[in-house]
């Protein structure tokens, strides 16, 4: 669901606009789509062999790809899936390029506000407080995809947009302020502003 939504959002980017994707594994495959010749698709590389300074030989992470991407005069940057160390790379991209998108695992759009800073702090890139400030300043929307599994009663598995939160740019009690702009209730959709 997350990757499908991200692909749909990418499809809205004009074909002549230069943008890049950074992924641990090629999942978006935007660079293979017809009419997408003005794209920089970079993939991380898993190292092997013995480790040097805590890294495997030949390892090239998403964070390592950021400087190369920033040299390419991109209008947007898509960081595939943010699981751990990619969080710092995503934050670096957000501060350098005006249009960024990414996906991550979280229980709700609201819980993403706490998950991202803790992932960034684990990588030692920013403190949690600095990460909260970066979220408030650089993120605009948080979209949550939910799996609805009705196979137990003969139905099917559906993924729906269950919540959309706007990040206002403000901070209260050291956390970014968000407002619900959309929420699905019991599989039904509704506009539900805070």
How does the language model describe each region?
Residues 8-136:
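Switch/coupling sub-region of P-loop NTPases
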Residues 2:
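Conserved lysine of the Walker
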Residues 136-194:
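Conserved P-loop NTPase
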């Amino acid at each position: 669901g997350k990757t499908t939504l991200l692909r749909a959002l990418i499809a809205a980017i004009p074909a002549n606009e230069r943008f890049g994707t950074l992924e641990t594994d090629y999942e978006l495959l935007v660079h293979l789509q017809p009419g997408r010749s003005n794209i920089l698709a970079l993939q991380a590389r898993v190292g092997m062999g013995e480790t040097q300074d805590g890294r495997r030989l030949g390892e090239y992470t998403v964070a390592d790809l950021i400087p190369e991407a920033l040299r390419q005069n991109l209008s947007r940057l898509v960081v595939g899936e943010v699981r751990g160390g990619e969080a710092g790379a995503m934050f670096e991209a957000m501060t350098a390029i005006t249009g960024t998108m990414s996906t991550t695992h979280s229980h709700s759009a609201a819980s993403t506000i706490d998950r991202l800073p803790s992932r960034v702090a684990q990588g030692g890139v920013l403190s949690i407080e600095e990460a909260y400030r970066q979220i408030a300043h650089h993120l605009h929307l948080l979209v949550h995809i939910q799996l609805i599994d009705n196979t137990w009663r003969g139905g099917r598995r559906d993924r729906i947009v269950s919540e959309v939160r706007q990040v206002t740019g403000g901070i209260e009690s050291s956390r970014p302020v968000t407002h619900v702009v959309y929420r699905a209730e019991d599989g039904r959709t509704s506009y539900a502003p805070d």
